[in-house]
């Protein structure tokens, strides 16, 4: 269910697809976390589609997801990197993959669809709150302490 602050996204959220882009990993946890984030965003009912894509090591790839979304008649596709900070992946690798995928699907997309590349998570007080919550949980013994696991 959409939260009050979700309404700021716009009245046409139903015409927007969001692609959460992760790095990818040989371990299953990375993909599982991204899928859970996708599920939670999807439950808000804001967007027509919410998908996950990976740079490497997992599927689906960025290119595969964009090509599939290109055929759905959406007005906007927002590519949201799920990375904490800017780096080579967010400033070079992902934009290049998006460009290649978008150009490859241009025949299916047409001129009226926009691909928007969002910023990584970055420095944000909401992240500070999460970090402080995790520290508090650790101090209060709600999480496994390192000395217990050694």
What are these regions (language model features)?
Residues 1-150:
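Active-site-proximal alpha-helix that buttresses catalytic centers in soluble enzyme cores
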């Amino acid at each position: 269910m959409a939260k009050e602050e979700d309404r700021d996204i716009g009245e046409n959220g139903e015409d927007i697809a969001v692609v959460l882009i992760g790095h990818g990993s040989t371990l299953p946890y990375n993909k599982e976390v991204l899928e859970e984030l996708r599920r939670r965003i999807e439950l808000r009912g804001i967007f027509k589609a919410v998908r996950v894509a990976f740079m490497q090591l997992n599927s689906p790839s960025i290119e595969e997801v964009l090509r599939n979304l290109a055929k759905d008649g959406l007005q906007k596709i927002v590519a949201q990197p799920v990375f904490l900070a800017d780096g080579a992946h967010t400033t070079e690798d992902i934009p290049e993959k998006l460009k290649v995928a978008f150009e490859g699907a241009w025949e299916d997309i047409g001129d009226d669809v926009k691909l928007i590349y969002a910023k990584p998570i970055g420095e944000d007080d909401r992240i500070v709150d999460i970090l402080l919550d995790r520290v508090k949980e650790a101090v209060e013994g709600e999480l496994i302490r390192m000395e217990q696991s050694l």
